[in-house]
Amino acid sequence: MSLLPYALARSFLFGMDAEAAHELTMDMLARGQRTPLQWAWCNETVSDPIELAGLRFPNRVGLAAGLDKNARCIDALAAMGFGFVEVGTVTPRAQPGNPKPRMFRLPEARALINRLGFNNEGLDAFVANVQRSQVRTQGRGQSKLLLGLNIGKNATTPIEDATRDYLTCLEGVYPHADYVTVNISSPNTQNLRALQSDAALDCLLGAIAEHRGQLAAAQGRRVPIFVKIAPDLDEAQVAVIATTLQRHGMDGVVATNTTIRRDAVQGLRHAGETGGLSGAPVLEASNAVIRQLRAALGPAFPIIGVGGILSAEDAVSKIRAGADVVQIYTGLIYEGPALVGRAAKAIRDLR
């Protein structure tokens, strides 16, 4: 059980600039992991196993990518009770991201807007951090936690050359991942969402599937690949994506990323900032895409539901919409690590 009441930490952190608070938190987690300090945020892992994409998830609540972009805090995050943790997005080369300020809180809506832009230390540093984590050094047979590695393209890479970046990242992370997520839906890298269109997605996933086949043959292990999509899609676009995922043998879909829509936060401070909106206002849009995906993909295709989970009831709504497991990020910032256990128990109690 966590020794530190999150309300106290949140009051302090929310008095700071949003990105400065984020960096301070990540530094604290990185320094405190694998030490007695970890008891400050440690929570029991709820047991609710599920088999999905050939993997055994210890429970159905995971961490969404974006919180730990450089894979510095895997062990600290594992201690919060997640069944799986996804880190990244990583790009082949280090990049600073977009100019600051680039992260904003909308507390009245329990939301965030960010335009970070895949700021990260690059593939080599990312992989080195993954390799150093206890989750990896103790071996896959010893660690129950599943680790997802999320990959993207550099901002300076022309969109027509994006496939090259994804294949470079796939090759780099492949030996260390329980699953890989292909991020084609961040609104903060110019033209990235164009990769969700019919022809572009077909080309990208075809190349990824072929390269995954080569890596699996060489390394003797087939790593599941998920694709992360946006909530800002109509039913026709969702149907095309669903067909393309199945055509190329993708193992699952992560639905959804942040939204560029602002309907739910109009008039609030920072609502006009450019970037992706996350948190409570995204819940229904994300759930709508999940329902459409489930209808298009059938009952067996794995869906990771993410977007707007700030309570146990929100997590349950994702499962009822058609997700198999869920991820949280903004909810962790507003509600703290206790949300992980509450959500996992609520989902377990559905059965």
UniProtKB/Swiss-Prot annotation:
Family: Belongs to the dihydroorotate dehydrogenase family. Type 2 subfamily.
Record's GO cellular component terms: cytoplasm; plasma membrane
Pfam family, one: DHO_dh
Catalytic machinery residues: S186
Catalytic activity, as annotated: (S)-dihydroorotate + a quinone = orotate + a quinol
Any one GO biological process: 'de novo' pyrimidine nucleobase biosynthetic process
Protein purpose: Catalyzes the conversion of dihydroorotate to orotate with quinone as electron acceptor.
Main location: membrane
Subcellular localization: Cell membrane
Cofactors (names): FMN
Cofactor note: Binds 1 FMN per subunit.
Pathway the protein acts in: Pyrimidine metabolism; UMP biosynthesis via de novo pathway; orotate from (S)-dihydroorotate (quinone route): step 1/1
Class of the enzyme per the UniProt entry, highest EC level: oxidoreductase
Gene3D superfamilies referenced in this protein's UniProt entry, alphabetically: Aldolase class I
Protein name from the UniProt record: Dihydroorotate dehydrogenase (quinone)
Subunit-structure text: Monomer.
Gene coding for it: pyrD
Binding site for FMN: A65, G66, L67, D68, K69, T89, N150, N183, K228, T256, G279, G308, Y329, T330
